[in-house]
From Swiss-Prot:
GO terms for cellular component: extracellular space. Residues 20-130, 151-160 form a propeptide. This is Leucokinin. Residues 1-19 form the signal peptide. The modification Glycine amide is found at G147. Keywords: Amidation, Cleavage on pair of basic residues, Neuropeptide, Secreted, Signal. It comes from the Eukaryota. It comes from Drosophila melanogaster.
Length: 160
Protein backbone atom coordinates (compact mmCIF):
# COMPACT_ATOMS: atom_id res chain seq x y z
CA UNK A 1 0.00 0.00 0.00
CA UNK A 2 2.83 2.35 0.81
CA UNK A 3 4.38 1.67 -2.59
CA UNK A 4 1.14 2.64 -4.35
CA UNK A 5 0.90 5.89 -2.40
CA UNK A 6 4.57 6.61 -3.13
CA UNK A 7 3.99 5.98 -6.87
CA UNK A 8 0.97 8.30 -6.86
CA UNK A 9 2.96 11.04 -5.14
CA UNK A 10 5.83 10.62 -7.61
CA UNK A 11 3.41 10.72 -10.57
CA UNK A 12 1.74 13.86 -9.26
CA UNK A 13 5.09 15.51 -8.53
CA UNK A 14 6.47 14.46 -11.95
CA UNK A 15 3.43 15.80 -13.74
CA UNK A 16 3.77 19.12 -11.95
CA UNK A 17 7.52 19.40 -12.62
CA UNK A 18 7.72 17.95 -16.13
CA UNK A 19 4.21 18.59 -17.37
CA UNK A 20 2.67 21.91 -18.26
CA UNK A 21 5.01 23.95 -16.08
CA UNK A 22 7.99 23.54 -18.44
CA UNK A 23 5.98 24.01 -21.64
CA UNK A 24 4.04 27.26 -21.44
CA UNK A 25 0.75 27.46 -23.25
CA UNK A 26 0.92 29.02 -26.70
CA UNK A 27 0.38 32.76 -26.72
CA UNK A 28 -2.69 32.45 -28.93
CA UNK A 29 -4.49 30.45 -26.22
CA UNK A 30 -3.79 33.20 -23.71
CA UNK A 31 -4.83 36.11 -25.95
CA UNK A 32 -7.98 35.79 -28.11
CA UNK A 33 -7.03 38.84 -30.21
CA UNK A 34 -3.72 37.23 -31.12
CA UNK A 35 -5.53 34.00 -32.03
CA UNK A 36 -7.80 36.00 -34.34
CA UNK A 37 -4.79 37.67 -35.96
CA UNK A 38 -3.07 34.31 -36.48
CA UNK A 39 -6.24 32.91 -38.07
CA UNK A 40 -6.54 35.91 -40.42
CA UNK A 41 -2.86 35.66 -41.35
CA UNK A 42 -3.30 31.98 -42.14
CA UNK A 43 -6.30 32.74 -44.37
CA UNK A 44 -4.39 35.54 -46.10
CA UNK A 45 -1.41 33.28 -46.77
CA UNK A 46 -3.60 30.49 -48.16
CA UNK A 47 -5.42 32.95 -50.44
CA UNK A 48 -2.22 34.50 -51.80
CA UNK A 49 -0.52 31.13 -52.29
CA UNK A 50 -3.48 29.63 -54.16
CA UNK A 51 -3.85 32.75 -56.29
CA UNK A 52 -0.17 32.76 -57.25
CA UNK A 53 -0.11 29.04 -58.02
CA UNK A 54 -3.23 29.38 -60.18
CA UNK A 55 -1.31 31.36 -62.81
CA UNK A 56 -0.23 29.28 -65.78
CA UNK A 57 2.91 31.38 -66.24
CA UNK A 58 4.07 31.25 -62.63
CA UNK A 59 7.03 29.06 -63.68
CA UNK A 60 8.04 31.66 -66.27
CA UNK A 61 7.73 34.36 -63.62
CA UNK A 62 9.97 32.48 -61.22
CA UNK A 63 12.50 31.59 -63.93
CA UNK A 64 12.76 35.22 -65.07
CA UNK A 65 14.37 36.34 -61.81
CA UNK A 66 17.80 37.91 -62.31
CA UNK A 67 20.73 36.62 -60.32
CA UNK A 68 19.62 33.01 -60.11
CA UNK A 69 16.94 31.31 -58.10
CA UNK A 70 18.64 31.58 -54.72
CA UNK A 71 18.75 35.37 -54.45
CA UNK A 72 15.40 36.01 -52.82
CA UNK A 73 16.67 37.91 -49.80
CA UNK A 74 14.55 40.90 -50.87
CA UNK A 75 11.33 39.08 -50.01
CA UNK A 76 8.89 39.03 -52.93
CA UNK A 77 10.19 36.32 -55.30
CA UNK A 78 8.50 37.72 -58.43
CA UNK A 79 9.70 41.32 -58.17
CA UNK A 80 11.22 41.46 -61.67
CA UNK A 81 8.41 39.70 -63.53
CA UNK A 82 6.30 41.63 -66.01
CA UNK A 83 3.37 39.63 -67.40
CA UNK A 84 2.19 40.17 -70.98
CA UNK A 85 0.55 43.59 -71.31
CA UNK A 86 -2.45 42.17 -73.17
CA UNK A 87 -3.96 40.56 -70.09
CA UNK A 88 -5.18 41.58 -66.66
CA UNK A 89 -2.31 39.68 -65.11
CA UNK A 90 -0.26 42.87 -64.79
CA UNK A 91 -2.86 44.39 -62.50
CA UNK A 92 -3.18 41.19 -60.48
CA UNK A 93 0.60 40.81 -60.07
CA UNK A 94 0.76 44.47 -58.96
CA UNK A 95 -1.97 43.74 -56.41
CA UNK A 96 -0.01 40.76 -55.06
CA UNK A 97 3.14 42.89 -54.81
CA UNK A 98 1.20 45.55 -52.93
CA UNK A 99 -0.21 43.01 -50.48
CA UNK A 100 3.19 41.46 -49.85
CA UNK A 101 4.82 44.87 -49.36
CA UNK A 102 2.11 46.11 -47.03
CA UNK A 103 2.21 43.11 -44.74
CA UNK A 104 6.00 42.70 -44.94
CA UNK A 105 5.60 38.96 -44.50
CA UNK A 106 9.25 37.88 -44.76
CA UNK A 107 8.71 34.30 -43.59
CA UNK A 108 5.98 33.74 -46.20
CA UNK A 109 8.30 34.35 -49.14
CA UNK A 110 10.15 31.01 -48.78
CA UNK A 111 6.79 29.23 -48.53
CA UNK A 112 5.75 30.76 -51.86
CA UNK A 113 9.11 29.97 -53.41
CA UNK A 114 9.01 26.32 -52.34
CA UNK A 115 5.41 25.89 -53.52
CA UNK A 116 6.21 27.43 -56.92
CA UNK A 117 9.30 25.26 -57.33
CA UNK A 118 7.24 22.16 -56.52
CA UNK A 119 4.46 23.20 -58.92
CA UNK A 120 6.98 23.84 -61.70
CA UNK A 121 8.64 20.49 -61.04
CA UNK A 122 5.30 18.70 -61.29
CA UNK A 123 4.37 20.66 -64.42
CA UNK A 124 7.70 19.78 -66.02
CA UNK A 125 7.26 16.11 -65.11
CA UNK A 126 3.76 16.08 -66.63
CA UNK A 127 5.02 17.69 -69.83
CA UNK A 128 7.85 15.17 -70.03
CA UNK A 129 5.42 12.27 -69.49
CA UNK A 130 3.02 13.67 -72.08
CA UNK A 131 5.81 14.00 -74.62
CA UNK A 132 7.06 10.49 -73.89
CA UNK A 133 3.54 9.08 -74.20
CA UNK A 134 2.99 10.81 -77.54
CA UNK A 135 6.28 9.41 -78.86
CA UNK A 136 5.35 5.91 -77.68
CA UNK A 137 1.91 6.25 -79.24
CA UNK A 138 3.51 7.39 -82.49
CA UNK A 139 5.78 4.36 -82.52
CA UNK A 140 2.85 2.03 -81.87
CA UNK A 141 0.91 3.57 -84.73
CA UNK A 142 3.87 3.20 -87.05
CA UNK A 143 4.90 -0.32 -86.18
CA UNK A 144 1.68 -2.09 -85.24
CA UNK A 145 -1.03 -3.31 -87.51
CA UNK A 146 -3.85 -1.47 -85.76
CA UNK A 147 -3.06 2.09 -86.79
CA UNK A 148 -0.82 4.71 -88.26
CA UNK A 149 1.00 4.74 -91.55
CA UNK A 150 1.78 1.34 -92.92
CA UNK A 151 3.55 0.47 -96.06
CA UNK A 152 1.18 -1.14 -98.55
CA UNK A 153 1.57 -4.86 -98.81
CA UNK A 154 2.64 -6.13 -102.21
CA UNK A 155 -0.16 -7.93 -104.02
CA UNK A 156 0.06 -11.68 -103.93
CA UNK A 157 0.36 -13.01 -107.47
CA UNK A 158 -0.94 -16.48 -108.24
CA UNK A 159 1.60 -19.10 -109.36
CA UNK A 160 1.25 -20.23 -113.01
Amino acid sequence: MAKIVLCMVLLAFGRQVYGASLVPAPISEQDPELATCELQLSKYRRFILQAILSFEDVCDAYSSRPGGQDSDSEGWPFRHYAPPPTSQRGEIWAFFRLLMAQFGDKEFSPIIRDAVIERCRIKSQLQRDEKRNSVVLGKKQRFHSWGGKRSPEPPILPDY
